[in-house]
């Protein structure tokens, strides 16, 4: 009897590929667009589009499995196209991790950076060393709320006042406050947001001389130092980036002056700055009236923040 060959054909509507193929093709596209971490970004976007964790994507890659419905893969492709145009990953996914928080971000709000976690840690370490029970903390230039929300959620009994200049950005701060309060209900009454100019002596004037610590990440990028990365240059709000002068120290210096009045004697200022600004800002802090000032490094060993005690 003649042999019958049965050709098994996949159904026409079957446009789901193995996760490994999806990631491989996506990584090629992102690499060609100049993305430094193409595989990582592709995996994160696929996880986001499919509504799963990064480890689920890794498992699918390892096991040769498929991942995501046709609809989810279509969403992935549109996210991929945005990333290939160098839109920041966090704006596409709509959130950014920071310490123990997952913060909502989007166009108009500065994306919190890992190095700022070091700045927060330096402030928390100081509070711990000094046995502060119910510290009064100020976060100037709040942005997404990363610094102040980390403090209020990690330090029981802390009172945080946050100042943000842009009403548009403050919407993101508020959103992150309500999201964080779902996880840490006690913080709602301990976090106070003010839409105001952080460099003005009128802002939070009622707190002058009573604050334990100011932790801040002000705009500090030198005007001469336009960021090379399109993600930063073309997407981060300029208001949150540039320090207002050629060397970028104008706004940081005004923040030092403001912090000096806010702090009680022996209070501390921890302020992020550019790698080039350490010596100048230490000298400025001392000239402004701080008793001690030094430069702290981030986890890469780069000069990253001013630490000053009033």
Which ranges hold each PLM region?
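Non-catalytic accessory regions of SAM-dependent methyltransferases
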Residues: 4-62
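Conserved AdoMet
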Residues: 39, 47-125
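Mobile active-site "lid"/loop adjacent to the S-adenosyl-L-methionine
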Residues: 219-251
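Conserved hydrophobic residues forming the short capping helix/wall of the S-adenosyl-L-methionine
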Residues: 30, 127, 177, 181, ...
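Conserved Class I SAM-dependent methyltransferase catalytic core
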Residues: 245-308
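Hydrophobic beta-strand segment of the Class I
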Residues: 45, 214-217, 233
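Short, low-complexity intrinsically disordered segments enriched in A/P/G/S/L with frequent Arg
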Residues: 1-3, 135
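Conserved SAM/SAH cofactor-binding pocket of Class I
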Residues: 115-227, 254
